[in-house]
Curated annotation (Swiss-Prot):
Documented activity regulation: Mycophenolic acid (MPA) is a non-competitive inhibitor that prevents formation of the closed enzyme conformation by binding to the same site as the amobile flap. In contrast, mizoribine monophosphate (MZP) is a competitive inhibitor that induces the closed conformation. MPA is a potent inhibitor of mammalian IMPDHs but a poor inhibitor of the bacterial enzymes. MZP is a more potent inhibitor of bacterial IMPDH.
UniProt keywords, alphabetically: CBS domain, GMP biosynthesis, Metal-binding, NAD, Oxidoreductase, Potassium, Purine biosynthesis, Repeat
Protein's UniProt name: Inosine-5'-monophosphate dehydrogenase
Record's keyword annotation contains Oxidoreductase: yes
Pathway assigned to this chain's UniProt record: Purine metabolism; XMP biosynthesis via de novo pathway; XMP from IMP: step 1/1
Residue ranges annotated for the CBS domain, each copy included: 95-153, 157-214
Induction annotation: By superoxide.
Active site, per annotation: 308, 404
Subunit structure: Homotetramer.
GO BP annotations, alphabetical order: GMP biosynthetic process; GTP biosynthetic process
EC number of the protein: 1.1.1.205
Cited NCBIfam families: IMP_dehydrog
Amino acid sequence: MWESKFSKEGLTFDDVLLVPAKSEVLPRDVDLSVELTKTLKLNIPVISAGMDTVTESAMAIAMARQGGLGIIHKNMSIEQQAEQVDKVKRSERGVITNPFFLTPDHQVFDAEHLMGKYRISGVPIVNNEEDQKLVGIITNRDLRFISDYSMKISDVMTKEELVTASVGTTLDEAEKILQKHKIEKLPLVDDQNKLKGLITIKDIEKVIEFPNSSKDIHGRLIVGAAVGVTGDTMTRVKKLVEANVDVIVIDTAHGHSQGVLNTVTKIRETYPELNIIAGNVATAEATRALIEAGADVVKVGIGPGSICTTRVVAGVGVPQITAIYDCATEARKHGKTIIADGGIKFSGDITKALAAGGHAVMLGSLLAGTSESPGETEIYQGRRFKVYRGMGSVAAMEKGSKDRYFQEENKKFVPEGIEGRTPYKGPVEETVYQLVGGLRSGMGYCGSKDLRALREEAQFIRMTGAGLRESHPHDVQITKESPNYTIS
């Protein structure tokens, strides 16, 4: 042990380049899909971080529509986080199998509240909560000129000539019915006229608009949620599972600690089929420990993030490329996967992270400036920025992430992150397009037809500081910013 203190050398993204190889594939033809687990498949290997200035329901919805995944942060109450997950799951479905409904005795106010809360344009009306026989529908058109919201729904709902379809109606069949009758919602009923589902024109349009969406077996967008290692973790997990979360992320600064291992084991024993991501770690030993405890996917990265100060405050970490490779080497032995979390500044770093052994990457700073992030927008020197902070910053720990850094009992915090601002970028769709485009280009240079080929066959070359300087634009003054290249 003593003799091996300085035996290893660590490499990060700026230390290496991928070597170009003979290619028979065009960038537009590469396959970017990846199976993180048997039941968790992404169409692009990009995940938004579970940070309180990066991912809430709006970001998670946008990421899933692009083919990726969003992780709802845990700096909120259990009920709020479960509600965020529910918003994602209800935002888009092929067939809504458990639609909201009201009864004729409810007030118009109840319909207005439900429609406003979930941003829906109508609600089926059933005779009562027990029988659930369809008797009408109320839409925003019915509410348009109503001033007395205490009226009963029975007085304003549409109940004549209701257009319905039987259970098992396909989306193509539903689209024809909706177009024929010029309506937006099609209730599905059984032979006793009981409400069994709902198909909306908006969901059909979204299927067409976002063909690459990441969805579960029921046609709903997929979403993950972060949890910690506090006393209420199992209660939080229970509520998230009830909200149909697709994956739980046990999110801590040091995943190779007994409390984290115990939590992983407890969740696995309670929910044998639940997808579990656990981290963060940076060594093969930690990866093995989490997998043996029950993790399906291991999250790799201690200190590489742009807003993280762990490496300088604590003096601990492993440069990210080396950490990814070491952890992936161990995960392969168990048939498990890893996520590279942190340190990615350009799209080329995504290609490097996946070639080093990652199955997907988790992004924070690259997405924090987009419209969908929950960070506040501010104006600085005439330009728009969004607030971005590490979960180890004082503000984030005060809000609820102190357990991530094992400081839940502290009255004063020792922060391992900072607060900052990042330029506003507009819709996340544009950012993801550029990032994925860079990945496609990199795979084309490497001759990799899919992500598995990139992991297995791509080769690295180490470069000097001079090589890094040569890699960036040099000897010119940039006069027009590129959408995929900015030096802060």
